[in-house]
Amino acid sequence: MASEKGPSNKDYTLRRRIEPWEFEVFFDPQELRKEACLLYEIKWGASSKTWRSSGKNTTNHVEVNFLEKLTSEGRLGPSTCCSITWFLSWSPCWECSMAIREFLSQHPGVTLIIFVARLFQHMDRRNRQGLKDLVTSGVTVRVMSVSEYCYCWENFVNYPPGKAAQWPRYPPRWMLMYALELYCIILGLPPCLKISRRHQKQLTFFSLTPQYCHYKMIPPYILLATGLLQPSVPWR
């Protein structure tokens, strides 16, 4: 049964939570909003406590803002161990990917997991290579699924009383299409996902244009989930 209360007043992250409308407009997979939003959590060493907050683009991309802020606070030394999880409305561009890799090379005790709602300009070869290089360097990059949307709603959003279980339900197919394209990027395959926009009605359309290499390299369970492969029906 859902709680009739909103986030507890004792929650130390309450003042840093974003509003429900912000979460909906920033993290909707079909909404191609230009601005980016970052929800993040940090676990320091063996501590059981998790520090959560959020950030948005300024004159710099939100990823760079985070790295600069964390470095300037003085808590992070070359031997400091911490685990960082990002929930990004857009995946990092190639320049941010380079900055992230440079940061991690200077702080080998830091681990980073990145969940993204959308892929930023995924047709750009530099952005594709940047994401691939992140994964190669040990960063976990994944597309947000239903469980991540639920988690973010409960832990980062100032939801109204009685709305703890009422996070936005976006069609899983959009998430699967982005996940398929991310898989293509990691494997070094050509783009498979095409996104088009009709500006008059502000409608976003997703389509898949697979090639032979996609069918050859991508696991069947992913192709089945996105409808690119039909399940076999046994003969009787």
UniProtKB/Swiss-Prot annotation:
Protein name as annotated: C->U-editing enzyme APOBEC-1
Cross-referenced CDD domains: cytidine_deaminase
Species for this entry: Oryctolagus cuniculus (Rabbit)
Recorded GO MF terms: cytidine deaminase activity; RNA binding; zinc ion binding
Function recorded in the entry: Cytidine deaminase catalyzing the cytidine to uridine postranscriptional editing of a variety of mRNAs. Form complexes with cofactors that confer differential editing activity and selectivity. Responsible for the postranscriptional editing of a CAA codon for Gln to a UAA codon for stop in the apolipoprotein B mRNA. Also involved in CGA (Arg) to UGA (Stop) editing in the NF1 mRNA. May also play a role in the epigenetic regulation of gene expression by participating in DNA demethylation.
Keywords: Cytoplasm, Hydrolase, Metal-binding, mRNA processing, Nucleus, Zinc
Tissue: Expressed exclusively in the intestine.
Effect of residue 96 to A: None or little editing activity
Cofactors: Zn(2+)
Known outcome of mutating residue 61 to C: Retains most editing activity
